[in-house]
Regions:
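Flexible N-terminal pre-Rossmann segment of NAD(P)-dependent oxidoreductases
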Residues: 1-13
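Conserved glycine-rich cofactor-binding loop
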Residues: 11, 18-20
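Rossmann-fold scaffold of SDR-type NAD(P)-dependent oxidoreductases
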Residues: 15, 89-96
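Aromatic pocket-lining residues of Rossmann-like dinucleotide-binding sites
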Residues: 29
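Conserved glycine-rich Rossmann-like NAD(P)H-binding loop of the short-chain dehydrogenase/reductase
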Residues: 32-49
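The beta1-alpha1 cofactor-binding region of Rossmann-like NAD(H)/NADP(H)-dependent oxidoreductases
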Residues: 43, 66-78
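Hydrophobic/aromatic anchor residues within beta-strands of the central parallel beta-sheet
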Residues: 62-64
């Protein structure tokens, strides 16, 4: 059966994706072919989710970047590191 949702060549930043709904969104987007940036304030939690996604869907499907979205400098860093990881951002999920 062909997937109804082809996210190949899509790159998503998902805020608050180290647990709960954000983690589920990241997992499903990766399942359908997207590269995902896992972000929250807690880098250890982000890294765990990214490792889980990468082990399930392949190396370099996910990366972890710590970010407090209320801090402008951290947001700039999130953008720069995300572009380094995947080249462009096609999707932003504001879950935090």
């Amino acid at each position: 059966m062909t997937s109804l949702f082809n996210l190949k060549d899509k790159n998503a930043i998902i805020t608050g994706s180290s647990r709960g709904i954000g983690k589920a969104i990241a997992y499903r987007m990766a399942e359908h072919g997207a590269k995902v940036i896992i972000t929250s304030r807690k880098i250890d939690a982000c890294e765990n989710v990214a490792e889980e996604i990468n082990s399930t869907f392949g190396k370099d499907t996910a990366t972890a970047i710590s970010c407090n979205i209320s801090d402008k400098e951290q947001l700039k860093n999130l953008y720069v590191k995300s572009k380094e990881f995947c080249g462009s951002i096609t999707t932003l999920v504001c879950n935090a």
